């Protein structure tokens, strides 16, 4: 089963092209990455898939759900971390996770601890003290 399907997905910004008739699919279990130079459409494609911006033409599905009609379900089941993320440097890892969980009303301290252990994150460390890679985790 394809977990991501794009069919002639297009995004234009006025007369400027974002992406043009992009068609591909990603099957369950495949490893896929967006690579390319600046302006190639990587971020545009990801933002379209999460319905953070709207397509000009074409269609796409994530987990079999339409990116426009079912965008709430898709965003509930996925995560998105843009490359340019800024945090409060004095905030601790645990504080950030609690803050983020609050958006969904799903604070689970045990799950938070298990996740931190799995990712080798110290919940008591300040964000400013983390390496770039650990901030991205």
Pin down the residues of each PLM region.
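ABC transporter nucleotide-binding domains
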Residues: 2-137
